[in-house]
Regions:
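Polar, enzyme-active/binding microenvironments
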Residues: 1-335
């Protein structure tokens, strides 16, 4: 048996490794045999591997829910309860920086909402009021880099007309939205994601022409109207979307189980990636490696490896079947 020098060069108390994430590093002297034991148990820190968590809040549809579920991308498995939104609602949009998650808009089940909430992702608890959208609006799309978050499109409460409005907030502050520009096509239940420089908004429902297959993009650090990027293979709404720094992934929709992807830095039509296990609308959040999908009406969570192609596999379960807008502290807009 190898000799064990368990201890810390500063403290006499032993500090044992307990996670694969880099931030869990424990100071001390360990034999190679002990390192192998810790690594086999998933407890030896890996340089460069950061803790990444995802969150799903509210509901996808026009029913009200205030639940916030949290998942761990490193360990995978079932979600845990994080806290509650300030107002119970569905059809909300979400985005995040590396430290703060934001959700806005939606429908309470009886009234439209312009409320924007935020959480500090490292600390479980209920959401806090951030500010307001320019108008009460349901089913906008959300996207962000580490500085700005965008709300794009949605349904106007007064006329039920689809909106082409893009608004933004500075995530590290609080306050009401500011006008950014317009989408090329007015829509609700579109979805958003992107890189640190580009924000994509795609698909969604148009009151006059049904669902849309249009993909738009904007340069997130500036302001102005969106530009056409390309098309999905079919028109649909309620698509789950997320990205790493290179690829944007779109999965499902109201009547399809198709997963498609685009390369964010280019333009063009979407390419087939694989299939999710159900044909349904859903939400998505991502780390640099993994895209995770959840669906209203089901507590099943599925995953794919973003850099490859193929069908989704099981990740775990959420605490409820609500599973509204998804965000994370490791998505492609943050690098």
């Amino acid at each position: 048996m190898p000799k064990r020098f368990q201890g810390n060069v500063i403290s006499a108390s032993a500090i044992t490794p307990a996670s694969v994430v880099e931030s869990a590093s424990a100071k001390g002297v360990w034999s190679l045999a002990e390192q192998a034991v810790f690594a086999g148990a998933g407890d030896w820190p890996v340089p460069g591997l950061s803790q990444v968590n995802g969150f799903f809040a509210g509901r996808l549809d026009f029913s009200g829910a205030n639940t916030i579920n949290e998942i761990d991308f490193v360990t995978e498995g079932n979600a845990t309860d994080f806290g509650d939104l300030t107002v119970s609602r569905g059809a909300i949009a979400g985005f995040s920086s590396s430290t703060r998650g934001v959700w806005g808009g939606g429908f309470t089940g009886s009234a439209w909402s312009n409320v924007i909430d935020y959480i500090t992702m490292s600390s479980a608890g209920n959401a806090t009021d951030f500010g307001d959208l320019s108008s009460v609006r349901a089913a906008p799309a959300g996207s962000s880099n580490n500085t700005r978050g965008l709300f794009s499109g949605g349904s106007d409460a007064t006329t039920n007309a689809r909106s082409n409005i893009i608004e933004y907030v500075t995530i590290a502050s609080t306050g009401n939205t500011t006008d950014f520009g317009d989408l090329t096509v007015a829509r609700r239940y579109g979805q958003g994601c992107g890189s640190s420089t580009r924000s994509l908004c795609f698909a969604g429902g148009s009151l006059d022409s049904g669902s849309s297959n249009v993909i738009d993009y904007v340069t997130i650090g500036s302001t102005g109207n969106a530009t056409d990027f390309g098309d999905l293979s079919s028109a649909r709404d309620s698509v789950g979307s997320c990205s790493n720094t290179t690829r944007a992934i779109f999965a499902g929709g109201a009547s399809t189980n198709t997963i498609e992807f685009v390369t964010i830095a280019s333009t063009g039509n979407a390419t087939d990636f694989g299939d999710i296990r159900v044909s349904a609308g859903g939400s998505c959040c991502a780390s640099s490696l993994t895209a995770v999908f959840a669906y209203s009406g089901s507590n099943e969570i599925q995953k794919v490896s973003i850099a490859t192609t193929g069908d989704a596999t099981d990740f775990g379960d959420t605490t409820t079947d609500n599973n509204g807008a998804g965000i994370s502290n490791g998505h492609g807009g943050l690098s």
